[in-house]
């Protein structure tokens, strides 16, 4: 359900917060003795039968017999972190743009054009999306790549009512074209690759390919990257307390108690 992209509606950004809210609410209700259906998945009127004419409930527990002894099958070990504040399908191109901007010396005005090559499934979602709202801008491949080339990042502050009207970024986005390539299609979904080519007015050109976006298990993610992502999200609300929260969480071998966190967050 991606129809929100057609008009830049706000619904998608509510989804993860609502999921976290519902998980916390379920735990609180259970702690007070609230009950739910004991066979919600496999029951005759459960989720599987509601969603499929041929449900296979055994797949829920297949290969779990030796799970405790096999850390390699725990999916949490293969979670990707979203380093950039845009659609995940844009991240390889954003990483490529940042790599080129970091490795070479040129001004935004020096850029003649930028070509992005990407896998087809990405354009199924991103093609035609215009940065008409801050949320829609996160799904605009030209806007995201232009932002990355200009600022060498794609933080939340790059997607505001003001930045989506910034003529320098928009003019650069107009120079960016994109297309699909079969060799990149063949890599997806094991990899989410992109190829970025930047040509300057003087004829110089730079090209790079990113197979795995920053934050993927194959690339790892550094503590500093995670900390910087937290700062960019939390600073408008916690201001200078962000580093205190990072220190409390990162310098522990165990999770801090909720009271410890609220004490830090509550003192501005």
Indicate residue ranges for each PLM-predicted region:
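Terminal-appendage/accessory-domain detector
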Residues: 4-21, 28-268
